[in-house]
């Protein structure tokens, strides 16, 4: 019976393999610094360079615990928004030169101090800085992070959102341009119509008809001019990607860590509407403009 159950267990695992939670193997490299001293903790504040197996830089989330040394740390979800804003304004998202220093270690150390400050594990105003470059960069990162309104969550909206009336231009009724507003850094979106007439299409700013658009592209709707008056609805569905601060769980002795990773999400807009009317009530030719200063003149006979 036990042998039968063992075979059954192996067979079940082949059919339904267990899903392993996302994780990152992290290790650290020491570098020498004696750049700040905590007056409240009565000790220097030190850090190390933490990297994932594929070379991404991670930051410590527990000032008093040890750095990872080859452990496989599972994901915990998105990090605190204040830490996220620090990461966007610190190293390595900004180069040492952009941060105002020439040494990557100063840029890295300043970013780590700003992370701990955001978590309220240290207070940069409590530190006795022994390196003026580090002091300036740390305070600059904290100030920019505090002023930031950047969100981790991916947002998407379509403008305009009100019903649009397409107007006749040459062979098509055309809407104005729609803009897909998003904080995603990359991705694509599709426009999905419900009840659209034959020949209706979506085109970018260059007039190219497309079924899929890149983030940053605008689109308009084109309806053939012979189409009877009417309307239809549509929605925009996007597959969008941006950096998010993903926290990874340590152990009672190994610190939690955070690394910026690209994450993708599906987003769908509410239903939008477009309509059009037949020109002149009978055909789709535009009305000739009325010119009151040029009245019709009957033929006149010269005397």
Residue ranges of each PLM-predicted region?
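C-terminal segment of classical bacterial N-terminal signal peptides
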Residues: 1-20
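Short, solvent-exposed loop/linker segments at the N-terminal edge
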Residues: 162-174, 300-303
């Amino acid at each position: 019976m036990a042998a039968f159950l063992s075979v059954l267990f192996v067979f079940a695992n082949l059919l339904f393999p267990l899903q392993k939670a996302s994780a990152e193997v992290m290790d650290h490299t020491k570098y020498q610094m004696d750049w700040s001293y905590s007056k409240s903790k009565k000790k220097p504040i030190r850090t190390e360079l933490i990297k994932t197996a594929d070379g991404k830089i991670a930051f410590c989330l527990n000032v008093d615990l040890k750095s990872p040394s080859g452990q496989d740390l599972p994901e915990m979800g998105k990090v605190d928004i204040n830490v996220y804003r620090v990461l966007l304004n610190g190293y390595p998202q900004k180069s040492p030169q952009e941060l105002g220093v020439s040494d990557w270690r100063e840029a890295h150390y300043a970013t780590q101090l700003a992370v701990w400050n955001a978590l309220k594990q240290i207070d940069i105003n409590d530190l006795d800085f022994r390196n003026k470059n580090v002091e300036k960069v740390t305070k600059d990162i904290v100030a920019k992070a505090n002023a930031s309104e950047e969100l981790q969550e991916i947002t998407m909206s379509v403008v305009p959102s009100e019903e649009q009336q397409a107007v006749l231009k040459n062979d098509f009724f055309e809407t104005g341009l729609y803009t897909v507003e998003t904080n995603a850094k990359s991705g694509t979106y599709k426009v999905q119509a419900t009840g659209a007439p034959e020949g209706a299409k979506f085109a970018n700013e260059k007039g190219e008809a497309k079924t899929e658009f890149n983030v940053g592209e605008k689109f308009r709707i084109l309806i053939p001019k012979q189409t009877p008056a009417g309307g239809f609805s549509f929605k925009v569905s996007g597959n969008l990607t941006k950096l998010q601060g993903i926290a990874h769980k340590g152990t009672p002795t190994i610190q939690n860590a955070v690394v910026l990773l690209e994450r993708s999400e599906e987003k769908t807009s509410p239903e939008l509407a477009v309509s059009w009317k037949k020109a002149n009530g009978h055909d789709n030719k535009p009305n000739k403009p009325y010119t009151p200063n040029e009245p019709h003149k009957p033929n006149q006979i010269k005397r």
